[in-house]
């Protein structure tokens, strides 16, 4: 059998990671009336081509204000294979279609019945791909020699006054062994992703023609990339890894669609680990053995920047490479509060190495070390919602810390992030403090110790030797900086002091200091001696003078 190009063009789109879509040029709809709305067919065609359609369809039937001359014009204007749709009854129409070099022709099995098979063969003889349309499973008996079958989700005998149901595709697709296309009633990306679970390609006309911005909508659907479909079906480690590496290459619309789809679907340890590996792969630096303290955020408590305060305090004991960013969905990110504390946040690898050598502290500003994700970062800011990057941020520190404290905002994330870090071979303590992504001074805190395996523990404020106290809200990075500075100077609020102290104690626990009460005492001694205030001043001065 000859290779006619129509099916192969659709298969090629799938191989390139795109959704295989036939975009229909449709002049009129029995329900919606004029679909051109003053636009030229040439403009519609250019929009389809530019947006990534794999093939073009045109209806020559008079009921849709189509004609044969326009078909000839379309074939001459595009390099994409063109499908002619009409109520074909005889061989003469096949010959006419071949004369204008259309690539494919629709044959409706319900109308042709027993003649369908001979018309399929006649199309092949004339170098045309026959696309046999079926609506009921009973129609399939007439399509046995077809290489490609279109499932029409509407009843063709009722024209378009049957609204159609994409469930038709789901019901009969498995009975078809040929290349499968679903058409009619596909009005959204969600509809497309649904039918693509059952078929190889989709034909869309009315939804494209009625879109406010046809090119943008077609681009989202055609180029919305198979990866969105993969996300909604579910990713494994390898697919999540490839997704993370591919994401920066997409345009903003597709990036937003992928991130939104990930949030809608949800993700577990394998996806978190694979995605984190893909993000971190291009950003590795060598600055020695360090620790990191980082939270995923999202706990809605709006507390001071605890992990940043702990990172500074911890640098009096062990080298710390704090990985962080500006706020995306919260009031104050680690970069924001460090800047408010007078610390230079943009340190390249050389400066970071010097800072570690001279102060035991360096800040690794995420945008500086993940430059390939700059467009992704812009999309995240515009979206204004939490994404998988919030969860994977602590796992993508370019310094590859030997041990980490990671705070998460839910018990589910505690389990999944701990498993993810185990999959990546990391050593860490993951904490969830009853609604906080920190150790909670007023309630229980669940922790997962990751060191080869994962061990679960539960801590109470009394385990640290402190009285329970509430967590005070914070309204800005400036306020957070003032309150951290006050604690380090021994003049801060007791609630802030206890909050930082127990999280510092847990960080020491991750380093092997097992007595939590003693760890709190170490913090208090450092406050009272002025060591923490001096350390903050040293970090700020060194960072700005380099």
From Swiss-Prot:
Needed cofactors: Mg(2+)
Entry similarity comment: In the N-terminal section; belongs to the TrpC family. In the C-terminal section; belongs to the anthranilate phosphoribosyltransferase family.
Keyword terms, alphabetized: Amino-acid biosynthesis, Aromatic amino acid biosynthesis, Decarboxylase, Glycosyltransferase, Lyase, Magnesium, Metal-binding, Multifunctional enzyme, Transferase, Tryptophan biosynthesis
Protein name, as recorded: Tryptophan biosynthesis protein TrpCD
Annotated region (Indole-3-glycerol phosphate synthase), positions in chain: 1-226
NCBIfam families, per database record: trpD
Molecular function terms, GO-annotated: anthranilate phosphoribosyltransferase activity; indole-3-glycerol-phosphate synthase activity; magnesium ion binding
Documented EC number(s): 4.1.1.48, 2.4.2.18
UniProt-annotated binding residues for anthranilate 2: 380
Lineage per the UniProt record: Archaea, Methanobacteriati, Methanobacteriota, Archaeoglobi, Archaeoglobales
Binding-site positions, 5-phospho-alpha-D-ribose 1-diphosphate: 295, 298-299, 303, 305-308, 322-330, 334
DNA-binding found in the keyword field: no
UniProt pathway: Amino-acid biosynthesis; L-tryptophan biosynthesis; L-tryptophan from chorismate: step 2/5; Amino-acid biosynthesis; L-tryptophan biosynthesis; L-tryptophan from chorismate: step 4/5
InterPro entries referenced in this protein's UniProt entry, alphabetically: Aldolase_TIM (IPR013785), Anthranilate_Pribosyl_Tfrase (IPR005940), Glycosyl_Trfase_fam3 (IPR000312), Indole-3-glycerol_P_synth_dom (IPR013798), Nuc_phospho_transferase (IPR035902), RibuloseP-bd_barrel (IPR011060)
Binding site for anthranilate 1: 295, 325
Reactions performed catalytically: 1-(2-carboxyphenylamino)-1-deoxy-D-ribulose 5-phosphate + H(+) = (1S,2R)-1-C-(indol-3-yl)glycerol 3-phosphate + CO2 + H2O; N-(5-phospho-beta-D-ribosyl)anthranilate + diphosphate = 5-phospho-alpha-D-ribose 1-diphosphate + anthranilate
Record: residues binding Mg(2+) 1: 307, 438
Cofactor, free-text remark: Binds 2 magnesium ions per monomer.
Region (Anthranilate phosphoribosyltransferase): 227-546
Gene Ontology BP terms: L-tryptophan biosynthetic process
Function: Bifunctional enzyme that catalyzes the second and fourth steps of tryptophan biosynthetic pathway. The second step is catalyzed by the anthranilate phosphoribosyltransferase, coded by the TrpD domain and the fourth step is catalyzed by indole-3-glycerol phosphate synthase, coded by the TrpC domain.
Binding site for Mg(2+) 2: 437-438
Domain of life assignment: Archaea
TM annotation in the entry: none
